[in-house]
Amino acid sequence: MFRQRYPDVHILTRETNTREQIVPLSEGALDLGLLRNTQLPDTLAWERVLREPLLAMVPADHPLARQPSVSLAALAREPFVFFDPHVGTGLYDDILGLLRRYGHTPVIAQEVGEAMTIIGLVAAGLGVSILPASFQRVQLSEMRWLPIDEQDAVSEMWLVWSKHHEQGALAKRFRESLLAWKTEHN
């Protein structure tokens, strides 16, 4: 939508994790950020742009792969491939918090920094994991995506900006376009 309206605008994107965006957003060095829900300082404003289910990933030859869905309890009993807590992704807090709310602490077999690495390691048979449904676009024959039984297994993505630093006209238009997209698609 934004690209169609403003084809000559070059958007400089920086791929960083949630934690790495908070200070630059607060200081006005970043105009906008897309973050998974996390604790934000009072200097930042946000609006939810996406709410999506979390899905389980299991190796294709795993017994759970034959099930139509899976519980958090069943996943927590398996070796877990998960985010490194030092990387600072909002998904780490989302997923671990969900498991803990249901009284589960996963046995973490492998910690990595990127979701794509998690997908590859699950496909290689090193464990199970959980990621948002938007990652389901990655289809590998060695793994299977499964719905999670618990209805509150969801993740949100937020558009975040500074409350105290004025945004340029194009950043404001981009924000308006993204929020209009959200209204159309939610």
Each language-model region and where it sits:
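Central regulatory/effector-binding core of bacterial HTH transcription factors
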Residues: 1-42, 111-112
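Residues at or immediately flanking beta-strands
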Residues: 8-12, 105-109, 156-158
